[in-house]
């Protein structure tokens, strides 16, 4: 699973996800992409599940690009621990995704296979998404 090799600080504030994506809203690598419509934190496990769903459906043909990286630490306290006594330890890593962000790109497969692969990937994610296609010049 994806996670940073090292970070400047171990823990972060929760923060909020406001506004639209400033960058990463266009297709850069592939012909088909999966674009977020809602703001949400996507965990490394969800990214990996979506990647596996796509590559399995494509039968390891074509190419997949993951355009988001889980760089936000999410902390959690152990089960049945009372409130207080400091912040919990890092439990998982997540990527903050704003509306309009392209999360995955696909190339090297035909239209039907690409759309179905992205639909399967979208089912693994906790947000509404849209399949986008690069217009040929």
Curated annotation (Swiss-Prot):
The gene is rplP. The keyword Membrane does not apply. Part of the 50S ribosomal subunit. Binds 23S rRNA and is also seen to make contacts with the A and possibly P site tRNAs. The keyword rRNA-binding applies. Belongs to the universal ribosomal protein uL16 family. Keywords: Ribonucleoprotein, Ribosomal protein, RNA-binding, rRNA-binding, tRNA-binding. PROSITE patterns: RIBOSOMAL_L16_1 (PS00586), RIBOSOMAL_L16_2 (PS00701). This is Large ribosomal subunit protein uL16. It comes from Roseobacter denitrificans (strain ATCC 33942 / OCh 114).
């Amino acid at each position: 699973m994806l996670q940073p090799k090292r970070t400047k600080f171990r823990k972060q504030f929760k923060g909020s996800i406001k506004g639209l994506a400033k960058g990463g809203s266009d297709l850069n690598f592939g012909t088909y992409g999966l674009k977020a419509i809602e703001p949400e934190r996507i965990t490394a496990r969800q990214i990996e599940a979506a990647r596996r769903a796509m590559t399995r459906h494509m039968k390891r043909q074509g190419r997949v690009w993951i355009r988001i990286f889980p760089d936000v630490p999410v902390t959690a306290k152990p089960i049945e621990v009372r409130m207080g006594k400091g912040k919990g330890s890092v439990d998982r890593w997540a990527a903050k995704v704003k509306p309009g962000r392209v999360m995955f790109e696909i190339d090297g497969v035909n239209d039907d296979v690409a759309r179905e692969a992205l639909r399967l990937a979208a089912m693994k994610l906790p947000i509404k998404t849209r399949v986008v296609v690069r217009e040929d010049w």
